[in-house]
Design a protein with these regions (language model features):
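Short Cys/His-centered divalent metal-binding micro-motifs
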Residues: 2-20
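Histidine (H) residue identity feature
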Residues: 5, 33-35, 61, 96, ...
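Short Fe-S-cluster ligation motifs
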Residues: 7, 30-45
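N-terminal accessory/assembly segment that mediates macromolecular interactions
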Residues: 16, 28-31
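Intrinsically disordered, low-complexity regulatory regions of eukaryotic proteins
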Residues: 21-26
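Short flanking/linker segments adjacent to small metal-binding domains or redox-active Cys/His motifs
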Residues: 38-79
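C-terminal, charged low-complexity interaction regions
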Residues: 67-212
């Protein structure tokens, strides 16, 4: 049982590094890992392994803000496996932070992905903006922040806890924890959005999100 668990964890660690290291916008260490550890894994395991990371792969070029063009791969990630990895990490961090197992419901948003569905993409950007606008900034934790760091926000007025996990200083995963016994607050904005009503969400800096 222990060997099976360790084997699965090792495979998940390799899968996660392969997925995350090369995301556009990450730091130099992510780029370095992509061209060393990740490249060796792909060469060793072949095309079948690459297909477990991305499906419908397209090779293209991306031009950064400095006008430098470099090759990238675009495709559909293994969403379910990524979700499972991020959930395991988030629950482990919750236990480490609060000294107890998390019991309740959680929601995970992969901020580093670009979603084909326009509404999902806008909701992602809205959640990102709201966290950026928080006046009380959380403590950033992690022994090796160039590879991974995380930050827990203080519980809001409803008792909901937000967590931001950052890989290679560029790829963020947003997690919301709702412990058992906490009543989910009524959210008029999301109710209107989900009902198909045209909705605007505006911020003090003039940023405006339009839905439907």
């Amino acid at each position: 049982s222990c060997e099976l668990h360790n084997s699965k964890k090792s495979k998940d660690d390799e899968f996660l590094m392969t997925c995350m290291a090369g995301v556009v916008g990450n730091n130099f260490l992510g780029y370095f890992h992509t061209h060393t550890k990740v490249k060796r894994a792909i060469i060793r395991k072949g095309q079948a392994f690459r297909n477990t990371i991305l499906e419908e792969i397209q090779e293209t070029h991306f031009k950064n803000e400095n006008g430098v063009s470099f090759p990238v791969l675009i495709g559909r990630p293994n969403f379910d496996r990524l979700y499972s990895c991020f959930k395991n990490i988030a629950y482990g961090l919750y236990y480490h932070k609060f000294g107890k197992r998390f019991e309740g419901e959680s929601q995970i948003m992969m901020d580093f992905l670009t979603f084909e569905d326009e509404q999902t993409e806008k909701i992602k950007l809205l959640v990102r903006k709201r966290l950026e606008e928080e006046t009380e900034k959380p403590e950033i934790e992690g022994a090796n922040p160039e590879i991974f760091s995380y930050a827990f926000y203080r519980p809001d007025e409803f008792g909901l806890i937000s967590l931001v996990m950052t890989f290679y200083q560029g790829s963020k995963v947003l997690v919301a924890f709702k412990e058992t016994g906490i009543k989910e607050p009524f959210n008029l904005t999301m109710k209107l959005i989900n009902s198909g009503v045209k909705t605007h969400v505006e911020f003090d800096d003039g940023t405006d999100f339009e839905f439907n």
